[in-house]
Amino acid sequence: MRILISNDDGIQAEGINALRACLQEQNEIYIVAPDRERSATGHKITMHRPLRVKEWHYPEAKTVGWAVDGTPADCVKLGLEALLPAPPDLVISGINLGPNLGTDVLYSGTVSAAIEGIINGIPAIAVSLASYDYRDFSFSGKLIKELVSAFGNRLPDKTLLNINVPPGKPCGIKVTRLGNRRYINIFDKRTDPRGRVYYWMAGEPFDLDEDDPDTDVWAVKEGYVSITPVHFDLTDYKIMERLKKLLKTAKILNRELKD
């Protein structure tokens, strides 16, 4: 398979290189990744300045790589439309250092890189090691290798798989839904040497449904690998029908609008 790999931790990160090492023997690998840490950039793209690209070489490997001074979404977009010699069969983003659970996916550069794949009709996987302290990516890499070998060509092209691997040896794999994760944020107010005020943001996750066994949050907490199907259609179809009825009742629906 021809696979485009990206991430948000940067092209030199341990996770992306562990993933490359697991996949490069049996697949045609291209890496397009940020030239530095770009975590929590969401789906930001660069429009008001040029993108700088540097070729990245991997000794004793056929992998072709590029480091981009942009976001993860920039990297995948650039790879698909300008750098790769042909469209990839699959986009994989990761292996991220740290979890991407619940509403993390809305902030995550890792997940956004995968979303850019499915926006362009290419199946995608986002994979994260759900720990900042445990840095053994070997199981995560082997799992992705197995998934790609088993059904890489049969993945849906409008839905990505968001995979979170717990630290240590997992006790199993669960197919899950996104949990409801919020953050208790702290903004540390400081003053720079010129007297200007600035803020450092920090925070801890607060999971509203951590006891729900259907969620990715619960699965990882209990030592399972979570696999969550995610798509970019944010439409609330139930509310859509209710809204039509409300507007019709209020005689607003289909009304001719005038200045």
UniProtKB/Swiss-Prot annotation:
This is 5'-nucleotidase SurE. Its EC number is 3.1.3.5. Nucleotidase that shows phosphatase activity on nucleoside 5'-monophosphates. Pfam families: SurE (PF01975). Binds 1 divalent metal cation per subunit. One of its GO terms (molecular function) is nucleotide binding. Keywords: Cytoplasm, Hydrolase, Metal-binding, Nucleotide-binding. GO terms for cellular component: cytoplasm. The keyword Phosphoprotein does not apply. It catalyses: a ribonucleoside 5'-phosphate + H2O = a ribonucleoside + phosphate. The lineage of its organism: Bacteria, Bacillati, Bacillota, Clostridia, Eubacteriales.
